[in-house]
């Protein structure tokens, strides 16, 4: 937790700093790092971000990448990764009122209806359904057990500055939980190593059963249609977290992951999607042998 405490201090004292051409440094020394002599990283609405190689785990650049922020719905990537290790895709669960009567975004999960793990994964990742996330957590063992397993999974993959408070990213007992851009990228990297997760997060839509019939769930990751080579991602927003995003793209056989946290879009300024595209473009232009840290 020493790095987490240092990141809190850095985020308080150096929140407005800009990226400079410096070599890698501990988070407590400088929250913004990129290789010496590399091009300046474009500005955007997210003050806390990371760009890394999805395959090697090498970090190309970051700003406040060890600073903790509430994850909002990006924590659903950790839920999905945990569920994929715990249950089969055709495992079923009956939705409960407690799981479905939640603050929305909602996918339309109905109490008393039976759903498969695959249907709930689609609804959790594509449209960020909090009802689907809670029901998927029930399939894993229930709210508390699922959250414990999510935190154990995070620790196992090296995301040691992450604490999930709920399956959905909404506040749980004690608050909203936290993660860092570094950990969020590491979690997404681990999830993308699972072919089922990679297929789900890349699909533009998926069918979902409702009382009115099957309806399509449309992927909320706009980078899939805005950025050539985008291969998946997860959005998030709460008042505490502001806008969050984690995603990946491929170009010429090279895959990058980005994570962006605690941003607000200002009228007339670049959008989150603009910043995501700029970070990816910057990363693809860099020498893959140069890095500042590892995931």
Segments the model singles out, each with a brief description of its role:
Residues 1-29:
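Secretory targeting and sorting signals
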Residues 10-11, 121, 181, 276:
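A generic alpha-helix preference that emphasizes hydrophobic side chains
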Residues 21-182, 186, 195:
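Active-site-adjacent loops and short helices of periplasmic peptidoglycan-processing enzymes
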Residues 33-44, 145-295:
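Penicillin-recognizing serine hydrolase domain
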């Amino acid at each position: 937790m020493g790095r987490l405490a240092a990141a809190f201090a850095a985020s308080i004292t150096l929140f407005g700093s800009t990226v400079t051409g410096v070599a890698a440094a501990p988070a407590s020394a400088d929250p913004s790092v990129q290789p010496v002599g590399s091009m300046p990283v474009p500005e955007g609405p997210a003050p806390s971000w990371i760009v890394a190689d999805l395959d090697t785990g090498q970090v190309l650049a970051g700003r406040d990448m060890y600073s903790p922020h509430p994850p909002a719905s990006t924590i659903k990537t950790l839920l999905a990764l945990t569920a994929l290790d715990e249950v089969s895709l055709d495992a079923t669960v009956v939705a409960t009122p407690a799981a479905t009567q939640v603050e929305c975004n909602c996918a339309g999960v109905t109490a008393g209806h039976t759903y498969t793990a695959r249907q709930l994964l689609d609804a959790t990742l594509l449209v960020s359904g909090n009802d689907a996330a809670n029901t998927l957590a029930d399939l894993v063992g229930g709210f508390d057990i699922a959250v414990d397993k999510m935190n154990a999974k995070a620790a196992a993959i090296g995301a040691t500055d992450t604490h999930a408070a709920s399956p959905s990213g909404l506040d749980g007992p004690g608050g909203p939980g936290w993660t860092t851009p570094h950990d969020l990228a590491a979690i997404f990297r681990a999830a993308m190593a699972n072919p089922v997760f990679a297929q789900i997060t890349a699909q533009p839509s998926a069918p979902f059963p409702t009382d009115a019939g099957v309806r399509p769930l449309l992927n909320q990751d706009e980078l899939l249609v805005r950025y050539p080579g985008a291969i998946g991602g997860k959005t998030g927003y709460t008042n505490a977290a502001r806008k969050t995003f984690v995603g990946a793209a491929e170009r010429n056989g090279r895959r990058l992951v980005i994570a962006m946290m605690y941003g607000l879009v200002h009228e007339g300024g670049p959008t989150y999607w603009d910043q995501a595209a700029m970070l990816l473009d910057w990363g693809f232009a860099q020498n893959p042998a140069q890095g500042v840290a590892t995931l």
